[in-house]
A protein has these predicted regions:
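Cystatin/cathelin-like cysteine-protease inhibitor module
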Residues: 1-129
């Protein structure tokens, strides 16, 4: 559900690419990663790194309304059949420094956050209690 191809245009600014990405647009939700993560993570720190031709964006901070630390890892990889497009998908989520989640769990957590934002919820701290 979160594996979506985006126009790449040859850029390597992984943070800007992920921030602008609307992973649920095909389902009528036009929120970007920046909209959601900046809303629910206190003073989020956006960082990127590369491993070969794959980029990773790490977003970390404290969940608003909570004292829990969160780390979101998003993978940006080239599409094998189209050099102008990339696949952007959640890799894992870490809470309070515990072991990273599975990709499926990361997708579920992010889906919940996107839907909460669409409903206008001020915070999602209760979800992580």
């Amino acid at each position: 559900m979160f594996t979506i191809a985006a126009n790449w245009e040859g850029s390597t600014n992984y943070v800007a690419t992920v921030e602008k990405h609307k992973p649920l647009e095909s389902q009528g939700i036009s929120l970007t990663y920046a909209n959601v993560l900046n809303k629910y993570i206190e003073s989020p720190k956006w960082e990127s790194r590369e491993s070969g031709n794959i980029g990773y964006v790490d977003v970390s901070g404290t969940i608003k309304g909570s004292n829990k630390k969160i780390g979101v890892k998003i993978k940006v990889s080239p599409m094998s059949n189209d050099s102008k497009r990339v696949s952007i998908k959640p890799e894992s989520i870490t809470l309070n420094g515990n072991s990273p989640s599975t990709q499926a769990a990361a997708e579920q957590i992010l889906l919940y956050m996107f839907l909460a934002d669409q409903r206008g919820e001020a915070d999602v701290a209760y979800y992580f209690d």
